[in-house]
């Protein structure tokens, strides 16, 4: 369990249990959200070569990047959105709208604290949207508390990092295919909530 700072301890012992209680009383679904970017020249893992030869990872020389945002729940659901430009407040609100319209129950969002997440426009949207019960900010410098961080590890290290993508179109399709494949793996997503630092948010924690 992630501990070691007053803010983290407060999150684990007070703030998140209160959020969880609100979710139970309202039959709300808690989503942990995060955004990231990935480049087409990212490589991970290992490759092979004949004995005595240096392994070479194939690269195309072309570089593309895509910004993304995703959210996962301890129930194994996931939502995501690829972003053609930069991430900003309007994009975050658009994603929040996608979350609340894709479920027939209230939504609570937990995320980190960049300015786009705490802007006045976001607060105004929350006030006007009864299906969104709140956007709660994780303690600063504590990404390990966010189960959604595992989405990017799955995407970059497990899939994209082993591909050779020659065009921006191929790259975008590969990103969306990987995210969609993960969306169809609820048990995999639930596993993101069972690591040392995210187990506090696992459903079994509250049984």
What are these language model-derived features?
Residues 1-207:
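Short functional hotspots at interaction and active-site rims
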